[in-house]
Amino acid sequence: MYRGLFLISEAVISRIEKKVLSGGKILFAEACDLALHCARADLDRLLALARQVGSLHHGKSIDLCSIVNARSGRCSEDCKFCAQSSHYSTGVDSYALVDPDYVLALAKQNEAYGVSRFSLVTAGRAVSPAFLREVASIYRRLGEETSLAPCASMGLLEPETAEMLVEMGVRRYHCNLETSASFFSEVCTSHTWQDKVATIEHARRAGLEVCSGGIIGLGESMEQRIELAFELRDLEVLSIPLNILNPIANTPFADLPALTEREILITFALFRLINPRAIVRTAGGRNLLAGQQKKLFLAGANGAIVGDYLTTSGDGLKKDIDMFLNLGFSIGSREK
């Protein structure tokens, strides 16, 4: 249980620091204790520890990816945060397939700025083999005309569709768990958390790398965020995008209170400590921190989705790159 505000001793903090800096695994109870403690004190110390752990495993490289909304709107699922769900009247644009020439132009623009990965993202519960045959030519052109690593985020997978993606040249599949298993039913009822895990397993068995993270600020507790971080560790996910809820009008989560900056920074730092070898990737919502978003990278983040997101705007590519360089990052990743 999340036990309220309290402070832990210097000896306990020092023991946790020594453990994680020597390659040991932080325990769930230790992460919860740090979250409780840092809600009142020693936030800078936690952030410094997260940076040290990140540097230990990843140096000063930052892994950049970008996405394109390849199929928008009319989604059958009822995720309560999502502008693309057909259950809510959000006014989002709807289209069956984005113009391939636009995709290639966007990909090349991103590549010119040092982005290393590019993903097609589709609205909907899943994609059919027929749809994948439609987008195969886009992936072929990406492979022929760019050096970007091609990724996909297309909902729930079956073994057949996972294998088709591999045959098309896709290297990495993204499927967010969204939130912890204990909170998922509060976020979505049209599919289950276990459906997400099955998709991750199908992708991995087919030979795809896996990218999976979630959204914070959905009404979950700090303890449930920590649960998610440990669930991702158990699944051995090595690319973890963390979104900060950007409330969409007319969705059930439109009026949820915003997280405080302190809560956000504690969350990012703990994800880094719990998943030291993963790329902890900032995603949608980081621009809500405005001029303070650089603090996410001082809290251990070492990856980012750059450019615009699916139905909300990001920061411009050049602005992002300038921020990363000013923070001392080199563009590109040591991720294997």
UniProtKB/Swiss-Prot annotation:
Entry function: Catalyzes the conversion of dethiobiotin (DTB) to biotin by the insertion of a sulfur atom into dethiobiotin via a radical-based mechanism.
Catalytic activity: (4R,5S)-dethiobiotin + (sulfur carrier)-SH + 2 reduced [2Fe-2S]-[ferredoxin] + 2 S-adenosyl-L-methionine = (sulfur carrier)-H + biotin + 2 5'-deoxyadenosine + 2 L-methionine + 2 oxidized [2Fe-2S]-[ferredoxin]
Gene Ontology terms, MF aspect: 2 iron, 2 sulfur cluster binding; 4 iron, 4 sulfur cluster binding; biotin synthase activity; iron ion binding
Gene3D superfamilies associated with the record: Aldolase class I
Complex formation: Homodimer.
Keywords, alphabetical: 2Fe-2S, 4Fe-4S, Biotin biosynthesis, Iron, Iron-sulfur, Metal-binding, S-adenosyl-L-methionine, Transferase
Entry keyword annotation includes Iron: yes
Pathway noted in the entry: Cofactor biosynthesis; biotin biosynthesis; biotin from 7,8-diaminononanoate: step 2/2
Provenance organism: Desulfotalea psychrophila (strain LSv54 / DSM 12343)
Protein name: Biotin synthase
Its EC number(s): 2.8.1.6
Pfam family, one: BATS
Broad class of enzyme this protein falls into: transferase
Cofactor: [4Fe-4S] cluster; [2Fe-2S] cluster
Chain ranges of the Radical SAM core domain: 57-286
Claim: Iron-sulfur is one of the keywords in the record: yes
GO biological process: biotin biosynthetic process
Residues that hold [2Fe-2S] cluster according to the record: 119, 151, 211, 281
Family per similarity comment: Belongs to the radical SAM superfamily. Biotin synthase family.
